A protein has these predicted regions:
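Signature for HUH/AEP ssDNA processing cores
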Residues: 1-93, 102-104, 138-164
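Helical (often loop-to-helix) elements that flank the catalytic cores of nucleotide-handling enzymes
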Residues: 99-123
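A recognition module on extended beta-rich or small alphabeta surfaces enriched in W/G with H and D/E
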Residues: 120-148
Length: 164
């Protein structure tokens, strides 16, 4: 049995309230319940599972990659992409997760290692924002389709933010 969760409105770019105890989703989020979220994520990224430790739906990074960065790096990187759709969600302790397409063979994934950026690599498990769990919430660009920004463009934006 699933319980519907009423989702508050969040305009893209709006400041997240100081207390992240409630999950925030943008108005475009089609999923308003646990079951809806699970179906939606599975359509985008493949099989999901509920992780009792994180109390979140998780998915393996096959159809995407993710970069975990500080709030400041995420803000600068997002601006550097000049309005390109970049799904970003927050994790309660000031961490931002930027969703990107998988790297191509030409992409250099080790460029991040000295920069303090954590890469959610191939087949790694990622906990996603989940209704009823206040520790992760979408900030911008709730993924509305399977198309994600190219890995190298997000890498360049984050590296530029690291240098700036």
């Amino acid at each position: 049995m699933s319980t519907a969760v009423s989702l508050p409105q969040l305009a893209i770019g709006e400041e997240v309230p100081a207390s992240p105890r409630r999950a925030l989703y943008p108005a475009s989020a089609p999923a308003d319940s646990f079951a809806d979220s699970q179906r939606y994520y599975e359509n985008l990224y493949g099989p999901t599972r509920y992780d009792a430790n994180t109390r979140a739906l998780t998915v393996r990074a096959h159809a995407f990659r993710a970069l975990m960065v500080t709030r400041d790096l995420a803000d600068v990187a997002s601006e550097a992409l000049h309005g390109q759709t970049l799904p970003i969600f927050a994790v309660r302790h000031g961490i931002r997760v930027l969703m990107t397409a998988p790297p191509t063979a030409a992409d250099d994934i080790v460029r991040f290692f000295p920069r303090g950026v954590t890469i959610v690599g191939r087949a790694a498990e990622l906990a996603l924002p989940t209704p009823g769990n206040p520790t992760r919430w979408w900030l911008a660009a709730f993924p509305e389709g399977a198309e994600l920004p190219p890995y190298h463009e997000v890498v360049e934006a984050v590296l530029g933010a690291c240098s700036g």
